[in-house]
Amino acid sequence: DFMEMVGKRLEKCPMEIRYAYQEQTKMLPEGMTVPPERGAKPWGTSHAVLCAKNEIDGAPFAVINADDYYGKEAFKVIFDQLSASEDPYGYCMVGYELGKTVTENGSVARGICEINAEGFLDVVTERTRIEQYEGGIHFTEDGGESWTEVAPETIVSMNMWGFMPSFLQEIKDRFSAYLDEYLPKNPLKCEYFLPLPISQLIAEKKATVKVLSSSDRWYGVTYAADKPVVVAALKNMTAEGKYPDGLWG
């Protein structure tokens, strides 16, 4: 139960908490219905953000994966960037080096970033099967028939984004076109991922995404075998005084 595991702990923090629920029929374009054969599968990360539109209430906002550790500095740099921005289409993201986000326990999905000389995102491409091997890191798009090498220092998105309120209207306006194109092709599994509308807005020169960096390391549990590494890292940070012993009191 989410409230038992997370909600009650968050209530101890000195901040306002609002809950938004990603439901299949929520924010669906008028006249659109959920194919019965799709089951309960959600519509993806863009739709998840869209479902929080009313709770965000017209303010700049950040998006993260709830089960990832990004480090304290990452939150500071994204807050500072959003607070200082006066551009209604000036977005941002925190990038991490690919080599510091892979696991030896299996493949991972990452958003590979192409960044221009001014430090802004040109393209983010979702690679759903990236693997670390003895000679380096590579990805495949054809089930392992062929592989493409990728440098460990390549910057990737770990889904830590900073947006202005304009983004909510953009993903709402583009959701219908996405469903018109992709739902007939893949009614069971198509998902409206964040990199798609972001890449569209950049290509249209309608928005910019500043790529921020953090000295903190990202941690996540993709496989059960990753958990001991993350647990040890968090214990070390607690021992170093970065976090209190007994985080939730």
Predicted regions and their residues:
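A C-terminal functional module that forms or caps the active site or interfaces directly
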Residues: 172-207
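Short beta-strand segments
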Residues: 20, 62-65, 93-97, 213
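Short, surface-exposed amphipathic charged segments that create phosphate/polyanion-binding patches used
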Residues: 29-40, 106-112, 225-229
